[in-house]
Amino acid sequence: HLSEQLGHEVSIRELARGEHTVLTAPITVACASSGNHGRAVAAGARHFGCQAVIYVPGDTLEARAKAVESEGAKVVRHSGTYDDAVRDVETTARDEGWVVISDTSWPGYEDIPKTVMTGYTVMAAEALEQMIALDAPRPTHVIIQGGVGGVAAATCGYLAETLPDDYPT
């Protein structure tokens, strides 16, 4: 988004220093989440000077919604399911000019989820690096939280590419 506006790649360092606050302040990022992803999007928005609107499904625990709010986001409690919230945030974001930051894709919206999932692979890479540093045996199994499947899919994909001959189940 900013890179397109500025005509050059914007670094995390530039954003963290607040070098583009004039441009980031009017940006609103949004997503549907029942907790962790929404909290991370809200924290990132706060850190980079953006606004965040997080749609939470009706069955989201109040403590999780409060945790998202604690990062400075506006929380919109949706009466429906997670999938309903995803559809509504996409529609509202399009109407309002917000940027959706989701790890769930749909036709025509693949780039940001791909980037989010690439970011998830950092956890798998760090875990594997620690195992190697400790001279630990390669993992035979991986157990990871499910959520909507983004972290699990990214982890499995990373391990399949990194350990093609010794892939854990």
Feature annotation, model-predicted:
Residues 138-140, 147-148, 153-169:
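Acidic, glycine-rich loop-and-beta core segments that form the ion-binding/anion-interacting portion
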Residues 23, 94, 163-165:
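Short, structurally constrained coil/turn elements
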Residues 27, 50, 73, 98, ...:
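A structural micro-motif
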Residues 1-29, 111-132:
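Glycine-rich oxoanion-binding loops at beta->alpha junctions
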Residues 1, 41-44, 48, 152-163:
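Short Gly/Thr/Asp-enriched flexible loops that form oxyanion-binding sites at enzyme active sites
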Residues 1, 68, 167-169:
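Internal hydrophobic scaffold segments of catalytic domains
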Residues 8, 12-56, 138-151:
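A short, small-residue-rich loop immediately preceding and capping a beta-strand
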